[in-house]
């Protein structure tokens, strides 16, 4: 999550790694890597502002994009081995890098109108794909070997393209919402896609790759800006944060009353030559039998199973630890908080620990850590 120092001048970027075991923080001076539990500083580098910092699970491979201040560039991607402090790759682009996603097979670099896909083993460029204008760099890459990447198909509607980054083929076109997409997330195994529109009132979850099952969740009735969405590692929960100050945790259950099942013909392989070569009409016609029903469901979407209250207006990211007993929250004003999560109870979660992301972790320092 790129926050650009708007809420704390010392925080430019915040994110978890793929399994939520580490926290990456970009600062005006460089970047830091923390272990999430126990909260400890793993690595720190001060070579200039970092606007994007992405890890590959808990490995030593880290991708960094500059903040654009001083001698750092938003058009330059550095991939470093932080264990040996050795640069692996240095790539320069014509336009600003908006997002970088990695799994064990691919590195995907997202610009406003292009996606570049690289083989992570040798950094060979496999494809450059033209996309519709995507000024926020919205996309999600599955961490697992399903290797799906999803991104908005248009700024004018809520359509989402699903692409296989191994075969470089478009797998599906999903009409998730009526208005444009504001947030996306994929589950660890790549079988679930969560979507939100710019209205931010309804969250949808689709079963991939064919979207033949879906769930709808009610975040609230008042429009909101969705800051982040993350699935739990086992895919049983979805955490959603917004500018309202309430972080919602929804339970994923396709046997519930808010679940829909549809029969859809599986689309055949489509051209890999970019979006301009994709037969949108063919994909849309194959899905026309069920898409209106997805969007205009007659039942009320489900409410959250649990929630967290934080100050409104501050961007945040929420994720569940592997055991689903702790919810972790990162905020743009430099806080890292841990909440007790009871799967048998739900409701409002209680704050257990609070840390400052700008201070050296020290459990004996009352300013750095508050254990409540």
From Swiss-Prot:
Database matches in SMART domains: WD40
GO biological process: autophagy; autophagy of mitochondrion; glycophagy; nucleophagy; pexophagy; protein localization to phagophore assembly site; protein transport
One Gene Ontology CC term in the entry: cytosol
Keyword match RNA-binding: no
Subcellular location: Preautophagosomal structure membrane; Vacuole membrane
GO molecular function per UniProt: phosphatidylinositol binding; phosphatidylinositol-3,5-bisphosphate binding; phosphatidylinositol-3-phosphate binding; protein-macromolecule adaptor activity
Residues making up the signal peptide according to the UniProt record: none
WD repeats: 176-216, 221-260
Keyword annotations: Autophagy, Membrane, Protein transport, Repeat, Transport, Vacuole, WD repeat
InterPro entries noted in UniProt: PROPPIN, WD40/YVTN_repeat-like_dom_sf, WD40_repeat_dom_sf, WD40_rpt
PANTHER family per record: WD-REPEAT PROTEIN INTERACTING WITH PHOSPHOINOSIDES WIPI -RELATED (PTHR11227)
Purpose: May be involved in cytoplasm to vacuole transport and autophagy.
Protein name according to UniProt: Autophagy-related protein 18
């Amino acid at each position: 999550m790129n926050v650009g120092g708007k809420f704390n001048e010392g925080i430019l970027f915040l994110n978890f790694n793929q399994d939520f075991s580490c926290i990456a923080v970009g600062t005006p001076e460089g970047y830091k890597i923390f272990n999430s539990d126990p909260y400890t500083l793993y690595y720190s580098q001060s070579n200039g502002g970092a606007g994007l910092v992405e890890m590959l699970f808990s490995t030593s491979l880290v991708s960094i994009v500059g903040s654009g201040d001083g001698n750092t560039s938003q058009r330059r991607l550095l991939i470093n081995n932080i264990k040996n402090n050795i640069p692996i790759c240095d790539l320069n682009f014509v336009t600003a890098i908006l997002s970088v996603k990695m799994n064990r097979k691919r590195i995907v670099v997202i610009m406003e109108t292009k996606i570049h896909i690289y083989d992570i083993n040798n950094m060979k460029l496999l494809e450059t794909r033209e996309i519709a204008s995507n000024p926020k760099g919205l996309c999600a890459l599955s961490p697992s070997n399903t290797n799906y990447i999803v991104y908005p198909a248009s700024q004018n509607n809520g359509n989402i393209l699903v692409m296989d980054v191994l075969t470089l083929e478009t797998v599906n076109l999903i009409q998730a919402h009526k208005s444009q997409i504001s947030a996306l997330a994929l589950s660890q195994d790549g079988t679930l896609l969560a979507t939100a529109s710019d209205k931010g009132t309804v969250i949808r979850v689709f079963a991939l790759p064919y979207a033949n099952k879906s769930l709808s969740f009610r975040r609230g009735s008042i429009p909101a800006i969705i800051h982040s969405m993350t699935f739990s590692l086992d895919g049983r929960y979805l955490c959603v944060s917004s500018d309202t100050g309430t972080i919602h945790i929804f339970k994923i259950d396709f046997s519930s009353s808010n679940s829909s099942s549809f029969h859809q013909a599986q689309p055949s392989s489509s051209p890999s030559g970019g979006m301009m070569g994709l037969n949108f009409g063919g994909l849309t016609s194959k899905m026309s039998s069920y898409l209106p029903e997805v969007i205009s469901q007659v039942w009320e979407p489900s409410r959250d199973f649990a929630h967290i209250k934080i100050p409104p207006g501050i961007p945040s990211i929420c994720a569940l630890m592997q055991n689903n007993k702790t919810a972790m929250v990162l905020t743009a004003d430099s806080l890292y908080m841990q909440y007790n999560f009871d799967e048998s109870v739900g409701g409002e979660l209680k704050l257990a620990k609070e840390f400052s992301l700008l201070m050296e972790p020290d459990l004996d320092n009352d300013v750095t850590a508050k254990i409540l």
